[in-house]
Swiss-Prot record:
HAMAP family: Ribosomal_bL21 (MF_01363). Keywords: Ribonucleoprotein, Ribosomal protein, RNA-binding, rRNA-binding. GO terms for molecular function: rRNA binding; structural constituent of ribosome. This protein binds to 23S rRNA in the presence of protein L20. InterPro entries: bL21-like, bL21-like_sf, Ribosomal_bL21, Ribosomal_bL21_CS. This is Large ribosomal subunit protein bL21. Belongs to the bacterial ribosomal protein bL21 family. Part of the 50S ribosomal subunit. Contacts protein L20. One of its GO terms (cellular component) is ribosome. GO terms for biological process: translation. Residues 96-146 are annotated as: Disordered.
Length: 146
């Protein structure tokens, strides 16, 4: 006998909402109330950060695709902590020589949590444009003394 649980209302609401955004030279698939590790940001813990470079937003049945970015869209993030990634070993060696070099690198990361994904539908401002008439100019007469 199998039992299936229905998702709670809060998870079902956020289940259909996601955004693909560009930050730190990479593209991330952001969902609300999830943690992400991105390259180190100059922000303190508990600071709020806004990302405006949104490539795609999906909300239920609506998909907004940017060219290259979606206008009036933003993602609100909260900095949770700063940390360092696992060490990456770089080993260089020349065969048949006694040349070996072992180095390592740890990437500095910032852990962020997505607070909200939003798109605002602002109507473009209508302004009355006045037509500017060009004055017809006649070519200047050349100076015969030259």
């Amino acid at each position: 006998m199998t039992s299936s649980k229905k998702p709670s209302n809060s998870s079902a609401k956020n289940e259909n909402l996601y955004a693909i955004a560009e930050t730190s030279g990479q593209q991330f698939w952001f969902e609300v109330d999830k943690y992400y590790d991105i390259d180190r940001l100059n922000a303190k813990e508990k600071d709020k950060i806004t990302i405006d470079k949104i490539l795609l937003i999906k909300d239920k049945d609506n998909i907004s695709l940017g060219q290259p970015y979606v206008k009036n869209a933003k993602i609100e993030l909260e900095v949770v902590s700063h940390k360092r990634d696992k060490k990456i070993i770089v080993y260089k060696m020349r065969p048949k020589k006694k040349t070996r070099r072992k180095m390592g690198h740890r990437q500095e990361l910032t852990r962020v949590m997505v607070k909200s994904i939003s798109i605002t539908n602002s109507t473009p401002k209508t302004s009355s444009k006045t037509e500017v008439k060009k004055k017809s100019t006649s070519p200047k007469a050349s100076n015969p003394e030259n």
